[in-house]
Amino acid sequence: MHDKILILDFGSQVTQLIARRVREAHVYCEIHPNDVSDAFVREFAPKAVILSGSHASTYEDHQLRAPQAVWDLGVPVLGICYGMQTMAVQLGGKVEWSDHREFGYAEMRAHGHTRLLDGIDDFKTAEGHGMLKVWMSHGDKVAELPPGFTLMASTPSCPIAGMADEARGYYAVQFHPEVTHTVKGRQIIERFVLQIAGAKPDWIMKNHIEEAVAKIREQVGDEEVILGLSGGVDSSVAAALIHRAIGDQLTCVFVDHGLLRLNEGKMVLDMFEGRLHAKVVHVDASEQFLGHLAGVTDPEQKRKIIGREFVEVFQAEAQKLSKAKWLAQGTIYPDVVESGGTKTKKATTIKSHHNVGGLPETLGLKLLEPLRDLFKDEVRELGVALGLPPEMVYRHPFPGPGLGVRILGEVKREYAELLRRADAIFIEELRGTTATAQDAAAGLCGEADVGKSWYDLTSQAFAVFLPVKSVGVMGDGRTYDYVTSLRAVQTTDFMTAHWAHLPYALLGRASNRIINEVRGINRVVYDISGKPPATIEWE
């Protein structure tokens, strides 16, 4: 049995990042709404509790409180932002509106050598005070400490930026240690979880396989399962895990909608039919998909058509597999969060995800989602532990609608052929080019990155087809051909992203190869937009 950390969600958009930081410390955790019952908290039996941030105001919304059982359990509690404020109010302190609201970077002074912050700082002042570079996002502030608490941290505009009652193991910070902008945030969360709470760091994917296999066997029994295999990381790892558990009780359905990457179908079939000896039904439905996409230019409409046609094709195949009782999906935790479908139901919906909600209930199948509570990095670790090749497991994310949302405007077979070849060349150049000491000296990467491929140094990279033509010259003749844009970003969480500063030589080679090898494209541009304001995908 794993030690568990209970994260109570008060509605913050970054609550899932708290969970990710805890998991990175190899400790299991779950997110649940702040209004769970006292009985639930006691039955959960956490080693510690973390209270999240919120968009709400502590003194205006009196419904957003932690259950009384949190304070009765006798376990350590960490309050973050709003979590600090509700801790203060519930334990006898005072919170009020701040005249100086803080949103963004701040330098915070640590006080009192508490167990949480002792020895953790980014720099020291001339007087020897430890300072932390943190990320703030609050309009209220704790004005009066609860009985038994001492000051733990402060900023010029927030005199009580942290507080602690070490006798009871209660700690609270006004900043957000879960976001990457707080430089020592991960260290602070690890300190709380591992040292203060004393949780065992035994949440390791290699060990998780045995538990997951046992759970799948218990759920499924001797019934059969079907899974839509896309070639992406999530569905591939889900397929490998389920196949490990139940073997030939699993049938994978691989639908080729004509919008896959170059040679993707062959790679998937070679892996699952050839190496894993799994049952795979291969359906070439490219004519059907491209036919329904003809004349459609709106991005959301394209997504809906691709989703609808996939359901139709998959449903037809599922009906042929009459013994199947389960539908398996590669849904992972961020999918659930982004669709506003967390266990808390408090996060605002960001976008509709193609996995969440799944296929229509008319299939009459039970849902099997063995990766639902895992983050992407955990899924990748699991995939490697299951024996999938790293080049498959560590591929960059690929949208469910495939190249359909990387072709701007109407989708045509001609456009898809041009794009997949251009994209393959760009990815090949990224994989084949390693960062050099000169790149590090120029600030394109860190010194520790020297020797790594630029594919591994980017989080997502791809080509985009622009349905416009430009004039060019090749040989002695004039050309009038299409334009493609290259896109590469670096990010830790995909919620924000920076465009990747790739070496000019790499971009030059990719451009020259695309123009020379892909007949029909005569101009290549590079997208230098961050997220925000742009999104990572163009559509």
Curated annotation (Swiss-Prot):
Catalysis performed (reactions): XMP + L-glutamine + ATP + H2O = GMP + L-glutamate + AMP + diphosphate + 2 H(+)
Domain GMPS ATP-PPase per the UniProt entry, residue ranges: 203-395
Record-level GO cellular component terms: cytosol
E.C. number: 6.3.5.2
Pfam families for this protein: GATase (PF00117), GMP_synt_C (PF00958), NAD_synthase (PF02540)
Pathway it works in: Purine metabolism; GMP biosynthesis; GMP from XMP (L-Gln route): step 1/1
Keyword terms, alphabetized: ATP-binding, Glutamine amidotransferase, GMP biosynthesis, Ligase, Nucleotide-binding, Purine biosynthesis
GO molecular function: ATP binding; GMP synthase activity
Protein residues bound to ATP: S230, G231, G232, V233, D234, S235, S236
Residue ranges of every copy of the Glutamine amidotransferase type-1 domain listed in the record: 4-202
Gene3D superfamilies per record: 3.30.300.10, 3.40.50.880, HUPs
Active site positions: C81 (nucleophile), H176, E178
Keyword Nucleotide-binding: yes
Function: Catalyzes the synthesis of GMP from XMP.
Assembly, per entry: Homodimer.
Name recorded for this polypeptide: GMP synthase [glutamine-hydrolyzing]
Name of the gene this protein is made from: guaA
